[in-house]
């Protein structure tokens, strides 16, 4: 068991041997190592504030890991895990098409009653179509279905379904996501073709949530969503792909013609050396109209 401040088994002496701890976490993701070391430093500062040598030891290791991670980010290099599971955007679309072919083969769209297997296949298709359209994190778990804006409590994520004589309009409402404090509430209109598919899914879904567990009794949790995504891609392409990797894949495709971070830094450095201004000042000096 690793560091758990809630456990009675842990006390400050647990971390008296830094090398042992470093060795214990060395094979974990750099981000995981960094987070664990940060937690230890915070813990030691509270529990053993006078042991500067011990705290500095962990702090230096934390800074070293942070530096390695920053270098990888600046180099825009895939991690080993990403390299093993990376797929192209076209391969992502191929998986979606393969699932749809299976849906057609089983005539699922013509059925009036779906067993759990058929429902799961249809849900997988709608889920991937949603993530192709909206490359979010695990924010599509626990999405509640509402029919009026008045039901939006400003806290949860919702699928707003509006149906009238002129047709149906659906909206994805995001109130709860990682960077909501920066970007605020987001309301996304959903494409009409996708609306038709969601309506079919909801015909067989009598709950108040968009995506359900296999038994169709409870909504997907964040962990359920991760496991489901992993199963889908392992089945159709033999790789472990989740929402985080899909975001990397899609934004890499979207920005594939942009200069790299390193190229931008090199240009900025040359301009700074030439004009003896910061990059910010050089951008302000630059006139485009």
For each of these PLM feature ranges, what is it?
Residues 183-246, 250, 255:
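Active-site/catalytic core of tyrosine-dependent DNA strand-transfer enzymes
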Residues 94-139:
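Basic, Lys/Arg- and aromatic-enriched nucleic-acid-binding interface segment
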Residues 245-277:
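C-terminal catalytic core of tyrosine-transesterase DNA break-rejoin enzymes
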Residues 58-61, 142-151, 253-254:
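Amphipathic alpha-helical scaffolding segments
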Residues 285-287:
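Eukaryote-biased recognition of C-terminal alpha-helical segments
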Residues 53-109:
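Flexible interdomain linker/hinge and immediately adjacent N-terminus
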Residues 1-63, 244-248, 275-278:
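Non-catalytic DNA-binding core/recognition domains of DNA-processing enzymes
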Residues 143-192:
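Conserved tyrosine-mediated DNA breakage-rejoining catalytic core shared by Y-recombinases
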């Amino acid at each position: 068991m690793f560091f758990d401040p809630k456990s009675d088994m842990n006390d400050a002496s647990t971390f008296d041997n830094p090398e042992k701890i470093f060795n214990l976490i060395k094979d974990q993701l750099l981000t995981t190592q960094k987070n664990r070391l940060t937690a230890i430093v915070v813990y030691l500062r509270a529990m053993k504030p006078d042991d500067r040598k011990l705290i500095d030891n962990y702090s230096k290791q934390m800074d070293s890991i942070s530096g390695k991670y920053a270098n990888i980010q600046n180099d825009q290099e895939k991690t080993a895990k990403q390299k093993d599971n990376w797929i192209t955007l076209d391969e992502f679309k191929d998986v979606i098409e393969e699932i749809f072919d299976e849906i057609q083969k089983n005539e699922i769209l013509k059925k009036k009653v779906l067993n759990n297997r058929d429902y799961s296949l249809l849900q997988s298709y709608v889920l991937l179509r949603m993530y192709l359209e909206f490359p979010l994190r695990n924010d599509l778990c626990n999405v509640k279905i509402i029919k009026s804006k008045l039901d939006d409590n400003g806290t949860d994520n919702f699928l707003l379904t509006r149906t009238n004589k002129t047709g149906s309009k659906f909206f994805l409402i995001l109130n709860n996501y990682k960077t909501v404090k920066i970007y605020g509430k987001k309301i996304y209109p959903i494409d009409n073709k996708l609306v038709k598919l969601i309506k079919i899914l909801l015909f067989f879904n009598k709950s108040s949530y968009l995506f359900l567990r296999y038994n169709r009794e409870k909504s997907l949790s964040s962990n359920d969503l991760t496991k489901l995504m992993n199963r889908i891609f392992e089945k159709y392409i033999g790789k472990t792909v989740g929402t985080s990797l899909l975001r990397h894949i899609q934004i890499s495709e979207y920005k594939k013609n942009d200069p790299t971070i390193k190229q931008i830094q090199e240009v900025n450095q040359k301009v700074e050396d030439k004009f003896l201004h910061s990059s910010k000042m050089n951008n302000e000096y630059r006139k485009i109209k």
